[in-house]
A protein has these predicted regions:
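Long alpha-helical repeat scaffolds
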Residues: 14-19
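Polyanionic/metal-chelating signatures
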Residues: 5
């Protein structure tokens, strides 16, 4: 955990000071922005870690080094919030942890709330990044592998938001317990902003027209 904590703190400082890098080294804006998003994705991936202390450290970095930073420009915070808000909200609810994690979550959300209030006070508009095209996979990638992740990434690069559903049980597969498989997928896609786990409380049978109709309406 100590090594992970140091690595996460380093990533947080890198994100805080990243705007100086773009001034010093001339490169296309797309390349610079992609690197920034990779750094943010690495921090978010730690929110899906199976170790609670790692998740707590990730929350601390997100709160203090990103949304609570006095160095990071408000427009950069807004850009990152727009991209990661949905993923962050999902990860906070997926791995709630114990009582101590509750205080970490509260502190992080407090930093985010202050950022939003301050940004809007001075005329900024905080939005979440959305896409019109949706791709849904009903248990196709179960068990989930790195090859499946690459397929999901390629689809989201085409402008889709990808949702992955985890089958409850299948007689045709020697599957691991449902929550274990869900955790594996969650850890694998935590750094992908437009790839999400489908909610567990909404079962979908693609052979059922009523389920397909409900899926389109969501």
């Amino acid at each position: 955990e100590r090594i992970v904590s140091v690595a996460l703190d380093t990533l947080g400082v890198l994100l805080e000071c990243y705007s100086r890098y773009t001034v010093r080294f001339q490169e296309p804006e797309e390349v610079s922005e992609e690197r920034r998003m990779k750094l943010l994705g690495l921090i978010l991936s730690c929110l899906a870690n199976y170790r609670e202390q790692v998740r707590q450290e990730a929350l601390l970095v997100i709160g203090q080094h990103i949304f609570g930073s006095q160095i990071l420009a408000e427009r950069d915070k807004s850009r990152m919030f727009s991209l990661c808000a949905k993923k962050l909200l999902f990860l906070l609810n997926e791995n709630k942890g114990g009582e101590l994690s509750l205080y970490y979550r509260a502190a992080t959300l407090s930093h985010i709330d202050r950022f939003i209030a301050h940004y809007q006070l001075f005329g900024g508009l905080v939005e979440t990044s959305t896409r019109e095209k949706i791709a849904f996979f009903p248990g196709t990638f179960d068990p989930f592998t790195l090859s499946h992740k690459e397929i999901a990434k390629k689809i989201q690069e085409l402008g889709f938001t990808v949702f992955l559903a985890i089958d409850e049980f299948s007689w045709s597969k020697k599957t691991q317990p449902h929550l274990v498989r869900r955790q594996i997928v969650n850890m694998s896609i935590a750094d992908e902003f437009y790839v999400h786990l489908f909610p567990d409380n909404t079962p979908v049978n693609i052979a059922n027209p009523a389920d397909l109709r409900r899926l389109r309406e969501m």
